[in-house]
Structures are given as structure tokens and as C-alpha cells.
């Protein structure tokens, strides 16, 4: 029987799907940064174990975490959700999570490639795309490192960000960018499932080459689409398949990766 993907978002801190519900845990899980400040990596790892056991017990087989963006300052948008701004620390966290979570039947999703980096907290991702204007090599030499560690450790999935990486692809958000997907495949070396972040939490149509964002997401190389209005996203993709915008070969490639993931994750 085909395995259904049942995902939750249990990062700890501001994003807790289960631990903030009465009857699951006595208290919400702390954010990884809080755990790190209290007990270092050992504290983070202990909290990770508790999260995964909770998800597994509740019947989930995917966690939309960990956040492995590098955030060095409290005025950066991912500061409260990330563990640290230190490359080595975040890389170790990504590696540990992959090695611990997945053998216990819960796939992780490394997020948000290529990273929100220095984007300030004042940037509101609910009103449109935000721009990272750092040099491409600066991003590759720092922000890619945690993703490489998680991928090398066997991470099944990676989530793309809704950031415009100005020096790599100024016309698309990462989730809609063929160039950023190529970076993830070729430079990071990831061959697993790529998914979008939520595609309709803002209007990203200006970055979709005149297409519907869900359609451009498939064309860019995503295998799974996250959308609150999933019916609209589905119908947009179906229309694009029927009119030839999305080819059968592209669909088969994405489906093959998803099916391979399901087989591996069983």
C-alpha cells in the first residue's frame, strides 16, 4: 500500500503543531535556540528526541523542520526559529536531526534553502518576497554548509525559501527559481524531494514568469507544493498539464522522486 505523507510542523518555540495542544505535552517545546542557550547541542538533541517521539506516537511521518537558516542577530527574521548563526553549530544540528529522526520513521525537511540569512525581522514575508542582496559566493560559502551536512547525513527533503537571491536569480523567489534548484541539486548534491514553502501566504505572481505560482513551482523543479488553497494550486497545475506547459516527463520526474522517498522512508 502507498504510504501517505502525514506532516506536522514541530520546530519548537513559535511553531509547535502538537506540543501546544492539551493532552500531548505538559508544555510547549522550546525553540532550538533557547535549548541551545540552556544546554548547548546536547540540550537541542534531547529536545529533538522528544519531538520525534511525540510525532511518531501521534501518527506523523514527516516534520516540517528543522530550520537551519543562519541567524546571527536578534533583528534578523529567522533568529527566533534558528539555533545559531555559527555554521559549525547549525551544521551539527542538521546532521544530528537527519541521523536521529529518520531511522525512527519521521522524515525531516531541511529549511529554508538557500537561507534567509541577513533578512531583517522587519521584513514581512506575508506581503511579498524579500530580497537577499549578498554576493553569491558569500551565500554558498556559509548558508549552504548546514544543508550540505544534512544532505550528507541522508535528509529526505528540503524546503525552498520565498526569498529573492539577487546575485543568483533576481527575477524569481528561490521556490520559483530553476537556478536555485540547480544550486541545490548540483552544488549541494541533493537528489531527494524538494518542496515549496507556503506559496499563497503572499502574492508571488510577479516572480512566476507570467504563470500561476504553483505552475512555475513545478517548472522550477519542486516535487511537492505547499499551499493553503490547495484546490486552486491543483487546478492551476492540471490546466498547465493539459495545455502542455508542464510536460509528462516533468511530472514523471517529480513523481519518481516522491515515490522513491516513500519507499526509502518506510
Question: Which residue stretches match the model-derived regions?
Answer:
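A charged helix-plus-loop insertion that forms the helical arch/lid used to bind
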Residues: 21-38, 84
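Active-site-proximal loop/short-helix segments
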Residues: 13-14, 20-21, 61-85, 111-129, ...
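Aromatic- and glycine-enriched pocket-lining scaffold segments that form the walls
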Residues: 55-58, 76-79, 235
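A short acidic, glycine-rich active-site loop
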Residues: 32-44, 133-139
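Second-shell residues forming the walls of enzyme active-site clefts
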Residues: 89-250, 257
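Glycine-rich, aromatic-flanked loop segments that form ligand/cofactor-binding clefts
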Residues: 1-25, 47-69, 90-115
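Extended, intrinsically disordered, low-complexity segments
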Residues: 254-259, 263-264
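Active-site cleft segment of glycoside hydrolase catalytic domains centered on the general acid/base Glu
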Residues: 37-44, 74-90
Amino acid at each position: 500500500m502507498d504510504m501517505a505523507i502525514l506532516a506536522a510542523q514541530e520546530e519548537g518555540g513559535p511553531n509547535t503543531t502538537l506540543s501546544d495542544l492539551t493532552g500531548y505535552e505538559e508544555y510547549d517545546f522550546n525553540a532550538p535556540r533557547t535549548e541551545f542557550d540552556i544546554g548547548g547541542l546536547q540540550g537541542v538533541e534531547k529536545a529533538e528526541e522528544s519531538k520525534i517521539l511525540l510525532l511518531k506516537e501521534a501518527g506523523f511521518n514527516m516534520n516540517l523542520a528543522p530550520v537551519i537558516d543562519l541567524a546571527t542577530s536578534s533583528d534578523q527574521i529567522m533568529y527566533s526559529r534558528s539555533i545559531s548563526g555559527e555554521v559549525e553549530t547549525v551544521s551539527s544540528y542538521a546532521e544530528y536531526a537527519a541521523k536521529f529522526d529518520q531511522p525512527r520513521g519521521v522524515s525531516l525537511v531541511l529549511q529554508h534553502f538557500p537561507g534567509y540569512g541577513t533578512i531583517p525581522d522587519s521584513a514581512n514575508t506575508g506581503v511579498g518576497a524579500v530580497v537577499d542582496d549578498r554576493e553569491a559566493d558569500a551565500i554558498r560559502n556559509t548558508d549552504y554548509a548546514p544543508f550540505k551536512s544534512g544532505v550528507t547525513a541522508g535528509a529526505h527533503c528540503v524546503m525552498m525559501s520565498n526569498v529573492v537571491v539577487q546575485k543568483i536569480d533576481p527575477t524569481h523567489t528561490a521556490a520559483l527559481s530553476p537556478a536555485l534548484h540547480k544550486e541545490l541539486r548540483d552544488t549541494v548534491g541533493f537528489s531527494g524531494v524538494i518542496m515549496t514553502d507556503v506559496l499563497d501566504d503572499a502574492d508571488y505572481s510577479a516572480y512566476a514568469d507570467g504563470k500561476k505560482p504553483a505552475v512555475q513551482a513545478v517548472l522550477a523543479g519542486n516535487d511537492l507544493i505547499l499551499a493553503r488553497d490547495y484546490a486552486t494550486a491543483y487546478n492551476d497545475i492540471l490546466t498547465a498539464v493539459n495545455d502542455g506547459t508542464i510536460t509528462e516527463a516533468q511530472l514523471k520526474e517529480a513523481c519518481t522522486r516522491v515515490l522513491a522517498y516513500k519507499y526509502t522512508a518506510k
